[in-house]
Amino acid sequence: MSRVGVVLLNLGGPERIQDVGPFLYNLFADPEIIRLPSPALQKPLAWLISTLRSGKSQEAYRSIGGGSPLRRITEQQARELQSLLRQRGLDATTYVAMRYWHPFTESAVADMKADGMDEVVVLPLYPHFSISTSGSSFRELQRLRQGDAAFEQLPIRCIRSWFDHPGYIKAMAELIAEEVRNSDDPEKAHVFFSAHGVPKSYVEEAGDPYQQQIEACTDLIMKSLAEHMGHSNPHTLAYQSRVGPVEWLKPYTEEALEQLGEAKTNDLVVVPISFVSEHIETLEEIDIEYRELATEAGVVNFRRVRALDTYPPFIEGLADLVTTSLEGPEVSLDAAAELPTKVKLYPQEKWEWGWNNSSEVWNGRLAMLGFSAFLLELISGHGPLHALGLL
């Protein structure tokens, strides 16, 4: 029997307060997160942003117990998925590959090779594809695969996204139904989907399918929920976790909550649609920040649907994804990460960024001036970045 390695891709998260700064550095050093005209700027900017943001982020992690539960939950998901796959007759072993914190992707690949796997299924724990989540993880795995003869020869099947998988939709609808039924008036309870946002340019310029998949997924869940409840509920989709001054997908969660409060919404059922595990965005951002904002805006009852975590129908859905993938053709990492519009993180043609012999000198001077301004603001504690809420 073929030995199957199932690689579960996820973001990762700091498990201790002292891990927050290094975790943020790894996050912002990824060109999929911040796109810059030169790779030489990536690490200095990542150091600067992680230094400036670590204090605020540490406070957030302290409010949920001092660290992220993401690794613990993901490893439990992996164990239960492995158990279920073996019950179905597969010789499967699961591996957790985090992008920005331990256990890193390199560790998962090393363990998989040491265990002598015969083929690989790559399953991102992101239902919806985005450049900055599944895309970044696929490309990191491809980087490790290139030049590694033992890894390169393994047949590989990548699951690009699964936002419309019946098992996922069913599990989400069931958990939402639990909270809707507990509302004062279940038929009028307003279902509020809060998805992690991405910059608008990802969708409009790079061809990222994330927004389309989120919207389609929301419609499928609401249809399934109506079948469970026997009636339709009003619902809203908004996007959270915006960082920086650039425009992200709208409506923003904060603004949508304020509007629902002004409309005298009595029962609000909040659904973390793009998150399959409890972590900082659910436990702190939604449960603390958004709950307070919604209450102040006038929402009477604020309920949050629990994350899928190890909910049995969800684990069954993941197992279905793996078995279906094994029945189909190989899907390469490059194919899984492909976008309709090619994204050039660092253009090979310098003119695409306005560079020529003279402008390159001025770009360097401006970059040094900007970096000096960053450092001055860091030392003084005052400046435009503080005004924009970045620091």
Curated annotation (Swiss-Prot):
Pfam families: Ferrochelatase. It catalyses: heme b + 2 H(+) = protoporphyrin IX + Fe(2+). GO terms for biological process: heme biosynthetic process. One of its GO terms (cellular component) is cytoplasm. Its EC number is 4.98.1.1. Pathway: Porphyrin-containing compound metabolism; protoheme biosynthesis; protoheme from protoporphyrin-IX: step 1/1. PROSITE patterns: FERROCHELATASE (PS00534). One of its GO terms (molecular function) is ferrochelatase activity. Keywords: Cytoplasm, Heme biosynthesis, Iron, Lyase, Metal-binding, Porphyrin biosynthesis. It is found in: Cytoplasm. Fe cation binds at H196, E281. It is an enzyme of class 4 (lyase). Belongs to the ferrochelatase family. Catalyzes the ferrous insertion into protoporphyrin IX. This is Ferrochelatase. It comes from Parasynechococcus marenigrum (strain WH8102).
